[in-house]
């Protein structure tokens, strides 16, 4: 799906990977670009707008842990531009010391935003179809002992995205669901592995993990922008050490209705 002339929302667009992806997306000649974030960085918003005057950039102060904030922000988008064509769910934290906050931001907030946004995009309701990109992690595909709670949240994102991205739903709504899984990237989130691990026993292996080869946020952001345009329902992509690769998950069981 080309993004030219489209209306795009990026939840968590002022983080490191998110902001790099935002800069890439500004080259796509979108009609409007809505950045939702708890962070308030007016200079970053101005810098985005300066990249392409053809795209109108909006900033919304956003609390992903609040259903009311989610509902109000999405309603505001529809009131301004009528249609939502792409929704990118990129808010996330890594702090295994606070399990509730980890789940509320990484998983529950993403689920609530998707469930609130998808009906607004549904071609059988008030939308015209589109794409939802949920940002999970390579730690949503494989376990990582130093960050067990974070892993659980990202495994949840993967399970939710694969379920709601079933062809049954896509054929009805016209809304594709794609999952993007960054590997270790040079951001403050990566640094948290070394200080906010699951158990005291985790310290040694978390420090070793911190020494793993990483990638630049600019590279990961470019991959994310590419995935947004793919519009491949059910697609799962890994961005790791500078390479973007499609993932085919192992299927152990399928519902009988298929």
UniProtKB/Swiss-Prot annotation:
It is an enzyme of class 1 (oxidoreductase). Substrate binds at residue 137. This is Alcohol dehydrogenase 2. It holds the Pfam family adh_short. It catalyses: a primary alcohol + NAD(+) = an aldehyde + NADH + H(+); a secondary alcohol + NAD(+) = a ketone + NADH + H(+). One of its GO terms (cellular component) is cytoplasm. InterPro entries: ADH_Ceratitis-type (IPR002426), NAD(P)-bd_dom_sf (IPR036291), Sc_DH/Rdtase_CS (IPR020904), SDR_fam (IPR002347). GO terms for molecular function: alcohol dehydrogenase (NAD+) activity. The lineage of its organism: Eukaryota, Metazoa, Ecdysozoa, Arthropoda, Hexapoda. The keyword Heme does not apply. NAD(+) binds at residues 9-33. Its EC number is 1.1.1.1. Belongs to the short-chain dehydrogenases/reductases (SDR) family. Keywords: NAD, Oxidoreductase. The active site is at 150 (proton acceptor). Gene3D superfamilies: NAD(P)-binding Rossmann-like Domain (3.40.50.720). The keyword NAD applies.
């Amino acid at each position: 799906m080309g993004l030219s002339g489209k209306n795009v929302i990026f939840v968590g667009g002022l983080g490191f990977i998110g902001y790099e992806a935002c800069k890439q997306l500004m080259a796509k000649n979108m009609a409007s670009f809505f950045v939702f974030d708890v962070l308030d960085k007016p200079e970053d918003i101005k810098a985005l707008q300066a990249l392409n005057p053809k795209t109108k950039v909006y900033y919304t102060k956003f609390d992903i842990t609040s259903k009311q904030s989610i509902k109000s922000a999405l309603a505001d988008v529809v009131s301004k531009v009528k249609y939502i064509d792409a929704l990118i769910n990129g808010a996330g934290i890594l702090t295994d010391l606070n399990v509730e906050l980890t789940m509320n931001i990484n998983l529950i907030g993403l689920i609530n935003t998707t469930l609130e946004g998808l009906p607004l995009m549904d071609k059988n309701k008030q939308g015209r179809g589109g794409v939802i990109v949920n940002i999970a992690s390579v730690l949503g595909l494989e376990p990582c002992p130093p960050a067990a709670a974070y892993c659980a949240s990202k495994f949840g994102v993967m399970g939710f995205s694969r379920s709601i991205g079933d062809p049954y739903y896509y054929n009805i709504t016209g809304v594709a669901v794609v999952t993007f899984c960054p590997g270790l990237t040079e951001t403050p989130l990566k640094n948290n592995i070394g200080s906010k691990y699951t158990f005291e026993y985790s310290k040694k292996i978390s420090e070793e993990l911190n020494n793993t080869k990483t990638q630049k946020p600019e590279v990961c952001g470019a991959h994310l922008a590419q995935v947004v345009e793919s519009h491949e329902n059910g697609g799962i992509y890994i961005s790791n050490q500078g390479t973007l690769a499609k993932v085919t998950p192992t299927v152990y069981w399928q519902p009988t209705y298929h």
